[in-house]
Amino acid sequence: MSAAADLEASTVLALGARGKHRGAPFTLAGRTCVQSDTGGLWNEWTLAFDDGRQAFLAETAAGFTLFFERPIAPAFEALTVGQPLASGFVVVERGQARRIARWGDVPESPRAYRYADLSSASGETATIDYGAGERSEVDVFVGRKVRLADLGLRPRAERRRFIAAPSGPTPKALELWLAVGDEGELATDGSRTRFRVIGITHRSIRIEGERYTWEEYVLHAPEAGVRWLVVSDGHWNLVESIEPALVEESERGARAFGELYKPWSSGRARLEWASGELPWTAAIGDVTETRDYVRAPWMLSCESTADELTWSRGTYTPPDVVARAFGKRLLPKPSGRAPNQPKIPKQR
């Protein structure tokens, strides 16, 4: 398949599809495929409402976010990742991107531009388009994550395409329990969703001189987006991204969802090996700063670089649950206790 065809297929939506938002009908009038300078790929859909309004729907690996324009725009040069703004938002990413393909009715805009993504504790997200240079017009859009069903849209049967993982031989000592292409049904967001394994990563970290390793199975579903099944020493966690502004760190730990999570570990995580497809461009040796906090059965994890900040929450998932979901006869027995493993009540 050609590169152009790959780009055209990197979506689960169709140009011209009709939907509704809060009772107002709209048409998916245009689509722009965008790539960041770090290789991340996403789609921006232009929503043309019948009443003349416009909005855009961001289709990313994490799901869908519906944006409407709103005026809040700090200077690009003044932004740093993790910085809280007077508007109540926190800067979670800044960088440069290129619009690499377009379809349908799309407003004229520079091919290359600078951008910043923001997060708020209220659940709103924002993206700022700073244009190509210092004197460019600045566009600000604020929105919330949505499900396609909320917009009266249905994903197409074919799955979107992601970015090929870096190639390399599989480490001899590495044992894999799921394979790219495996499918399983897991409970997420109060319902059961069928996911497909699209990629696998093997990572390591050194803490107080000791080297630890784990595997991350990247899962994808057209409606739900991306999740991860992370396994270390036979212990599994189902992980999903959360809005960074929902987390407040202090010396005592990290507070999120009304609960205090205790500090567990921090260090520099390194990518050792990968296979399949990933939602981002990866290279063997990539390093991120990590911090983990626990409150059983959950683990909060922060990963950051100079230009990006992400938070995720993992839920301890017994091996038999994973085995049943993916039709595996047997998964390895866990070794020791996981930091967020729930305690088993004593029998009286």
Predicted regions and their residues:
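Mixed-charge, low-complexity intrinsically disordered regions
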Residues: M1-R348
